[in-house]
């Protein structure tokens, strides 16, 4: 057979292969174009958070499940050493969202800063004592060494004082109170240097895993102060003018974090996956999981705001101007309410 004949016979095969290649390349280009378009369209939200905070757990869930990509969001995280650093970042414009409390938001609003608060967690601290301790009630703390995390104007401490004063007990005067860093005080209590500690919920979970018991959870005294439920003290905080300009971003971000919370609320396997972040063994991890789940806010904003107004009065009475400034009530507009349709 001549070379010319062979060439004629091969030409259709070559043309078919070329056509297939062109189709493949076209499909690849279209897919890549769509991918790049999605990436280009993704909007960025800047978070400033504590490296060891529980928000880090949720953000890991967001990334692992692609919740940010599904919402067309790019969440840029700056890790900070303290809550105060987050406040500076927000006020300085280097962060869009931080985690703080409505008390601070209300104070900032009274000073002219238009910040808003969206509930993030209702996990509260507790008074913890060794399993062998004779302490049964807070009245038993009179004359005892009580380690209080966070300082003299810590919210849990002020709430506890307000509740106990209704029973004629002044823990600030009747107990030997020591203030300090949460983990340091937990260690001292563990070593027997303190009789009990009022500490943050995650530190309490750590102590619970060490065999300590809860004498009283702060959520247990809220009804005595007029609250109707477990109030969310911590929330996402951002500028309301920024939120108005980026309503879609805010809505999608809050939706993404709600989905992450639901995964952590329903999946024990997810807790095993993030155990490296919690830095807890299996028994301790279960305690962290259960306490975290108890603190997921599920109440309407109206209920949260009403309880915040009630608790503000207690905190203002106990903490004074150093805590709330010259404000006498929760500032209007403190709680974020999305615009309809956003």
Task: Describe every region a protein language model picked out.
Residues 22-34:
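Bacterial N-terminal signal peptides
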Residues 36-42:
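Boundary at the C-terminal end of the N-terminal hydrophobic targeting segment
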Residues 43-172, 176-179, 188-191, 195-201, ...:
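Short, glycine-/small- and polar/acidic-enriched structural segments
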Residues 102-103, 183-275:
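Pocket-lining segment of extracytoplasmic ligand-binding domains
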Residues 121-127, 133, 212-213, 232-236, ...:
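Small-molecule pocket liners
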Residues 243-321:
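Secondary-structure end/capping motifs
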Residues 309-342:
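Conserved C-terminal helix/tail region of periplasmic/extracytoplasmic solute-binding proteins
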């Amino acid at each position: 057979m001549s070379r010319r004949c062979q060439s004629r016979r091969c030409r259709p095969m070559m043309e078919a292969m070329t056509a297939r290649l062109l189709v493949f390349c076209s499909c690849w280009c279209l897919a890549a174009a769509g991918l790049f378009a999605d990436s280009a369209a993704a909007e960025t939200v800047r978070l400033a958070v504590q490296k060891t905070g529980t928000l880090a757990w949720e953000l890991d869930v967001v990334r692992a499940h692609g919740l940010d990509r599904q919402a067309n969001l790019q969440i840029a995280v700056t890790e900070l050493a303290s809550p105060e650093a987050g406040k500076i970042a927000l006020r300085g414009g280097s962060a869009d969202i931080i985690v703080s409390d409505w008390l601070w938001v209300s104070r900032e609003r009274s000073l002219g800063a238009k910040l808003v608060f969206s509930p993030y967690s209702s996990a509260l601290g507790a008074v913890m004592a060794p399993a062998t301790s004779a302490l049964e009630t807070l009245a038993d703390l009179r004359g005892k060494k009580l380690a209080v995390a966070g300082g003299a104007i810590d919210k849990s401490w002020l709430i506890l004082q307000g509740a106990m004063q209704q029973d004629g007990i002044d823990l600030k005067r009747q107990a030997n109170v020591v203030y300090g860093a949460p983990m340091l005080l937990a260690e001292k209590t563990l070593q027997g240097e303190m009789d009990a500690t009022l500490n943050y919920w995650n530190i309490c979970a750590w102590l619970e895993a060490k065999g300590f018991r809860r004498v009283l959870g702060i959520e247990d005294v809220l009804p005595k102060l007029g609250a109707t439920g477990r109030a969310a003290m911590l929330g996402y905080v951002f500028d309301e003018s920024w939120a108005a300009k980026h309503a879609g971003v805010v809505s999608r971000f809050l939706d993404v974090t709600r989905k992450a919370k639901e995964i952590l609320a329903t999946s024990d396997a997810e807790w095993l996956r993030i155990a490296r972040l919690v830095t807890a063994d299996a028994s301790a991890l279960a305690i962290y999981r259960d306490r975290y789940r108890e603190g997921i806010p599920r109440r309407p904003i109206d209920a949260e705001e009403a309880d915040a107004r009630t608790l503000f009065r207690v905190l203002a009475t106990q903490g004074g101007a150093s805590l709330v400034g010259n404000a006498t009530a929760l500032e209007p507009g403190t709680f974020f309410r999305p615009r309809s349709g956003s």
